[in-house]
A protein has these predicted regions:
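Alpha/beta-hydrolase superfamily serine-hydrolase fold, recognizing
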Residues: 1-113
Length: 113
């Protein structure tokens, strides 16, 4: 339910403006590109109460359609930044382990090419 998301639309717009400044979003943000082909493998982790949930899953679908390897981890009931708020709980540790395992696999692939 988007009404329970702690990171809201206003915060999201501010965040993108602060991050991008005057940069071209299509260059600075891979998800804003029309063609996602050729991007590096991706790991996308998001909680069901994260404002970016729908945007993240749509990006993952676009990556997959473009032939980019993409692992998606959805955490039921989690909000944006949950793993930073409670880094020592099991769900956060599993989330971090998943990130690390995906990065290791991607780096192993890059060493073979």
């Amino acid at each position: 339910n988007p009404h329970y998301r702690l990171w809201n639309g206003r915060a999201n717009r501010f965040g993108w403006r602060a991050y991008l400044g005057d940069a071209d979003a299509r260059v600075a943000v891979p998800g804003r590109r029309d063609d996602l082909g050729g991007l590096a493998p991706a790991w996308i982790g998001v909680g069901t109460h994260d404002l970016l949930h729908d945007e993240d899953l749509a990006y993952a679908e676009r990556l997959t359609a473009a032939g980019v390897p993409c692992q998606v981890e959805v955490v039921e009931g989690a909000f944006h930044g949950f793993d930073r708020v409670a880094p020592n709980v099991g769900v956060s540790q599993r989330f971090f382990t998943s990130q690390c395992n995906s990065l290791r696999a991607a780096l192993a692939l890059s060493n073979r090419t």
